[in-house]
Amino acid sequence: MELNIRRLEESDYETLVKWWDWWPGWEAPPKTLLPDTGFIVEKNNVGIVSAYVYMTNSKTAIFDWVVSNPEYRESDRKNAIRLLIQATETVLRDQGIKHIFSFVRHKNLLKIHEDLGWDIDKKPSHEIIKNL
């Protein structure tokens, strides 16, 4: 079967929380931290990988909170990640976005971004958040 991508729905959050909780060192972000826009790649109605997109008041978007289904181990997993990134790029480009930021920890995800032409800062910065 073919990989498909669709917009995230509110009902997907519970599934994504299970994925985040499975991965060591990760904690699901609270729903109040997430934007309304996001995408998920599926095959045969099984979610593989998803991400959220924050829109800004400039020509910039933030591609973040990438998480994958830990139980999905088929050979097209990397292709699903590539599809997620490339489809998001296309949607954002069509909306007039000129720049996309992403925050990446996992070395394989970083490599996929690099292979797709993203500029990788060689001096990583820290993610800082304050809950009010």
Language-model-derived ranges and their functions:
Residues 111-118:
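Conserved active-site tyrosine of GNAT-family acetyltransferases
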Residues 40, 46-55, 61-64:
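Conserved beta-strand in the GNAT
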Residues 59-76, 126:
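Conserved acetyl-CoA binding element of GNAT-fold acetyltransferases
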Residues 103, 119-132:
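Conserved catalytic-core motifs of GNAT/GCN5-like acyltransferases
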Residues 74-90:
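Conserved acetyl-CoA-binding loop-helix of GNAT-fold acetyltransferases
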Residues 1-29, 124:
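Short amphipathic alpha-helix that is part of the acyltransferase structural core
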Residues 101-111:
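Conserved beta-strand-loop-alpha-helix junction that forms the acyl-donor binding cleft
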